[in-house]
Every structure is written in C-alpha cells, then in structure tokens.
Amino acid sequence: MKILVFTDLHGSLNALKELTCSEDFRIADKRIFLGDVCVGCSRPNECIELLNSLDCIKILGNNDYYICDHIPKEEFTCSSEGKIAQMKYMQNLVTEENKKIVNSWSKEYCLNVGGKTLYFTHYPWENVNGEFNVVDDPIEKNFKTISELFSNVKADVVVFGHEHKSRCYTNGEKTYYCLGTVGLVSPGNYLIIDVNDNEINFEEKFINHDINYEIDLMDKAGYPYNRNKIKRAN
C-alpha cells in the first residue's frame, strides 16, 4: 500500500493544484491531509473546496479549528498582535459553508495495515475548560520528548505536522515522523509511506509551486501575513 501524506497547506492553492496533478497523488492507494488548510496564504476557500472534492482523508489543524469561531482565550493572551489580526481576518474570509466542511474533519485518523498501526494527526490536542488547543512544543526535540508528547497513542508509526519542519524520530521499533509544509515554502514537501508485508518505508518528496504568485495576491489585497514564514522563492 502506498500512502501519500501532506500537511500545512495554509491557503496555498497553487501548492494543492500542483500536488493533486502529480503522478504520486494519482497512484496513491490512500491520501491523507494532516490539517491547517487555513491561515497563511489568502485562498483558503478555494483550497477547502478542492480538498472537499478529493478522495482524501482530511484531518483538522489548529488553525482550521480557530477559524471556525473557536479561537481559544489563551491564543488572545499569548499570540502576537499580527497573529490575532491574521486569524480574525481569516474568520471573516472563510465562508460559513466552508467552515462547516472544515468543522466536520476529525482530529485524528488511525490505519491498521501490514500488521502495523499507523496514527495520523496534526499535533496533540488538549481540552482546557472546554476549549481545544494544540499542546505546547517540547523545548528539546528528540525521540524521548516526542514519545512523551504522544504517550497516549498506541501505534507503531505516528505521523504529524504543525511544526513546518521535517524530522523523523525512531528507536527501531516505533517511528514518529513530523512533516514540514507543502504550502508555505517552495518547494513544499510531502511523504510517501510504502507498507509492504511487515515493512514500512518512508520517502520524503518535494514539489515546486508558484509561492510568489500567492504572495503577490496577499500584498495586493493587503492581507496580514507573516513574512518570516512565507517567503518568496528565488
């Protein structure tokens, strides 16, 4: 079985179009999106509608949750003024119909194949007084701290996003794979998981897309975005 996993699209329609037109996307037995279709680039509605039309498992990201009128109070106290302005702008930009679509996505997905259990999520969630938020990142990232982060997950492989940096942590028996982002940079990355009998292989792949066009759209619209996270390609 070939599983294609991608994450952190962040409203980059060009990235999604390039990925869905790829041979890898076409021949994959299963496709899984790990969340954060919103907040970043300025075309979340188009991305949501295209994702919704695809044969693809969709998982809720923290920014997706926030734009569905669920911005936790903690986000207002610890986020920068620019981040809050961006989330409020996005809440107004995403249509009510698309919010309903996003709000229907699950926070996790589990797959049993080849005698192995694979677990997919955007990032670990916590419920504080009825408000969901992703947990804080560990200061030091290694197999021990990441395994503690997912201590309640019983799986052979855990695949997640959120951090926008690609990392793999393994002890030979259990693997934690953190994907980067397909949408915020070009080339963006995605993951092919090949499960054959009891063997699991990972191949990280890259796809070029016109991030400069997305940035031009945001500049023209006066959209508040983080220029440290979304950068022009050379």
Question: At which residue positions do the language-model features occur?
Answer:
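Acidic, His/Gly-rich catalytic cores of divalent-metal-dependent hydrolytic chemistry
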Residues: 169-234
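Active-site environment of divalent metal-dependent phosphoester hydrolases
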Residues: 10-15, 39-42, 63-69, 126-127, ...
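His/acidic metal-ligating clusters that form di-metal
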Residues: 25-29, 94-169, 228-230
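Beta-strand-turn-beta hairpins that frame and shape the catalytic cleft
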Residues: 1-4, 110-119, 171-176, 200
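Short, glycine/charged-enriched secondary-structure capping and boundary segments
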Residues: 18-21, 46-49, 72-75, 134-135, ...
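Active-site neighborhood of divalent metal-dependent phosphoester bond hydrolases
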Residues: 54-110, 139-151
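Active-site neighborhood of phospho(di)ester-bond hydrolases with catalytic His/Asp-centered motifs
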Residues: 6-7, 31-36, 57-62, 121, ...
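N-terminal active-site segment of His-dependent metallophosphoesterases
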Residues: 1-50, 54, 223-226
